């Protein structure tokens, strides 16, 4: 299993041709968007989710996954705006960038608006604002200087609002802890203990003022960046979660209440920077009454809106390229599988928001889409004989090896072959060395893990948890989804760095583990109903006689929590010899793929939250 759920494969006769799933028309969605279910512009048809066992063209009955059809067709391009690609908007953006840089500099020039009693929180506020609005890439030097200044005043008790503050401040300390830690500064979570009373509760007044609530918001946000063994961060998360949920029941609807709701919804390891920026744009500075602060938020907000919309013109070009690849590769002939290339491109655009990372976005979308097709081929459509043949032939990496394969497998063989070669050429341009054989080995290991699961399905074998989990981390697909796309970036990955972010590194192991664990908690019931027994849940129950599903889920959720903390440490360890910039995109791939499982199996049921993500971050511009 990969980043999708699975159903049992048929293991009888060999089939050489694809099946065609029937599509049933159900109730329409309220929003008009382009889909393959449209019979004419403006008419949306919800695709079918029915299960079936159709007879293929050569008379052999094969299972289908019952997944709904592709939600998007080529008309999606029409919905992407190119208006903000005009030079005038870019020129306005450049002027705003200069003005925001002046905002950073004005703090250091002792502007009358700032004083030694509030300068630390003001500095942290502007750094936090540009990061949450998705515009921080323009201010790397300013952010570094600002955080160096804040860190120079950091103490074992935290910091106050300003350099001359006598008493440490919870809001400043919590925001400082989070921001400094995310930038690799060695700050200890122990500072939070100074804000706890004897009962372990965090000191706050019962008045629930806006300032009080913002302190707890930042305490909650800081608690999510926990490292293994930090009990005070666990206590902070429990306290702040309860406090904020109760506060939402009492305070009136406002930008603050919406921000609190968004923060509680956006847990750290499924947080997508572009989605966060889109949501924060809607609440940033809405209720600001201070005239000078309002002028600052307006500049930041205008720049954030421009950046968001300008990026859409680039997305249109990239998506057009992806759709051509999908069509030219013949994916429309592969009717037994899900087609999620648009969804995967959206996820890529949400984690790699820098314009220069086009090859990463397209490479990630292509790799993930191929993973999905292979998953459905191994779990649903292929027979054991066909799959064993495909597994053996792919290791030859020779187009002539397709002669003995069924027609549908020939197509997939060549798609994989061409994609791996294409991205290897791009990687050689970026990295200055040949990585083709390295990438091929990663794909071979991945396909071997699929073959192992196919054998378990065919024989009805239920492995032990450890046996299943070790194979499942490979079959999660995280490694092959991340490896070649990151190598196409303008970030150097010499061998000594690559081995610290790719297999067999701890970072890769944990990222793969969380995808397998969370994926199984979202998919196991549907998989079991279709006849596939093996999952983390069922294997845990086998190893622990008498354990219930609830026991298994509780255990796995606890493991996931620990894995997230371990991932935080692998990314942010201040003593690591590997820079955060080299690890960040592997970490972000984990976040993107994990997002697909945040609410449900969003890769098999992509017409709810996953569809909403496409609409909000790809198709809809931000209004001015």
Curated annotation (Swiss-Prot):
Pathway: Terpene metabolism; oleoresin biosynthesis
Residues annotated as binding Mg(2+) 1: 375, 379
GO molecular function: lyase activity; magnesium ion binding; terpene synthase activity
Binding of Mg(2+) 3, residues: 527
Cofactor note: Binds 3 Mg(2+) or Mn(2+) ions per subunit.
Binding site for Mg(2+) 2: 375, 379
InterPro entries to which the protein is assigned, alphabetical: Isoprenoid_synthase_dom_sf, Terpene_cyclase-like_1_C, Terpene_cyclase_plant_C1, Terpene_synth_N, Terpene_synth_N_sf, Terpene_synthase-like, Terpene_synthase_metal-bd, Terpenoid_cyclase/PrenylTrfase
Cysteine disulfide partners in this protein: none
Catalytic activity, as annotated: (2E)-geranyl diphosphate = (-)-beta-phellandrene + diphosphate
Role summary: Terpene synthase (TPS) involved in the biosynthesis of monoterpene natural products included in conifer oleoresin secretions and volatile emissions; these compounds contribute to biotic and abiotic stress defense against herbivores and pathogens. Catalyzes the conversion of (2E)-geranyl diphosphate (GPP) to (-)-beta-phellandrene.
Protein name: (-)-beta-phellandrene synthase 2, chloroplastic
């Amino acid at each position: 299993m990969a980043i999708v759920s699975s159903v049992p494969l048929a293991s009888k006769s060999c089939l050489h041709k694809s099946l065609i799933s029937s599509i049933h028309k159900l109730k329409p969605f309220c929003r008009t968007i382009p889909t393959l279910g449209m019979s004419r512009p403006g008419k949306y048809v919800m695709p079918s989710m029915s299960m079936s066992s159709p007879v293929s063209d050569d008379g052999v009955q094969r299972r289908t996954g019952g997944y709904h059809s592709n939600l998007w067709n080529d008309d999606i391009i029409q919905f992407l705006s190119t208006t903000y690609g005009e030079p005038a908007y870019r020129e306005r953006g450049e002027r705003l960038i200069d003005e925001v840089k002046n905002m950073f500099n004005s703090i250091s020039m002792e502007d009358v608006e700032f004083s030694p009693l509030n300068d630390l929180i003001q500095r942290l506020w502007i750094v936090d604002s540009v990061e949450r609005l998705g515009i921080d890439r323009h201010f790397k030097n300013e952010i570094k200087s600002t955080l160096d200044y804040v860190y120079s005043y950091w103490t074992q008790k935290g910091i106050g609002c300003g350099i001359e503050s006598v008493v440490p401040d919870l809001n400043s300390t919590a925001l400082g802890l989070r921001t400094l830690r995310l930038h690799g500064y060695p700050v200890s979570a122990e500072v939070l203990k100074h804000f706890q009373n004897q009962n372990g509760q965090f000191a706050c007044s019962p008045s629930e003022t806006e300032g009080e609530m913002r302190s707890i918001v930042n305490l909650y946000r800081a608690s999510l960046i926990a490292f293994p063994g930090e009990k005070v961060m666990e206590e902070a998360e429990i306290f702040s979660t309860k406090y904020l949920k109760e506060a939402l029941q009492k305070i009136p609807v406002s930008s603050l209440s919406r921000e609190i709701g968004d923060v509680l919804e956006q847990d750290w390891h499924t947080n997508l920077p572009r989605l966060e920026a889109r949501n924060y744009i809607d609440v940033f500075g809405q209720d600001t009454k201070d005239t000078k602060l309002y002028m600052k938020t307006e500049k930041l907000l205008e720049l954030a809106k421009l950046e968001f919309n300008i990026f859409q013109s680039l997305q249109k070009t990239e998506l057009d390229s992806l759709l051509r690849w999908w069509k030219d590769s013949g994916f429309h002939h592969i009717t037994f599988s899900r087609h999620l290339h648009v969804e995967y491109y959206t996820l890529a655009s949400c984690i790699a928001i820098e314009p220069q990372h086009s090859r990463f976005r397209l490479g990630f979308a292509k790799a993930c889409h191929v993973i999905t097709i292979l998953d459905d081929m191994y779990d649903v459509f292929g027979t054991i004989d066909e799959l064993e043949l495909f597994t053996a032939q792919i290791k030859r990496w020779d187009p002539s090896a397709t002669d003995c394969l069924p027609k549908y497998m020939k197509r997939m063989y060549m798609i994989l072959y061409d994609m791996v070669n294409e991205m290897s050429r791009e990687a050689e341009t970026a990295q200055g060395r040949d990585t083709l054989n390295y990438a091929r080995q990663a794909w071979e290991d991945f396909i071997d893990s699929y073959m192992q699961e196919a054998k378990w399905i065919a024989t009805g074998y239920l492995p032990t948890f450890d046996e299943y989990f070790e194979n499942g981390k490979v079959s999660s697909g995280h490694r092959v989804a991340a490896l070649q796309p990151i190598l196409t970036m303008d970030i150097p990955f010499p061998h000594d760095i690559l081995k610290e972010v790719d297999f067999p590194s701890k970072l890769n192991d944990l990222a793969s583990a969380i995808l397998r664990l969370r994926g199984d908690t979202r998919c196991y019931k549907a998989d079991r109903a279709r006849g596939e027994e093996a999952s983390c849940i069922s294997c845990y129950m086998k190893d622990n006689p008498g354990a219930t599903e609830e026991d298994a889920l509780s255990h796995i959720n606890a493991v996931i929590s620990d894995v997230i903390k371990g991932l935080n440490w692998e990314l942010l360890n201040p003593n690591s010899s590997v820079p955060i910039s080299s690890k960040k995109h592997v970490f972000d791939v984990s976040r993107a793929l994990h997002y697909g499982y945040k609410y449900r199996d969003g890769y098999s049921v992509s017409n709810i939250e996953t569809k909403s993500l496409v609409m909000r971050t790809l198709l809809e511009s931000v209004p001015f």
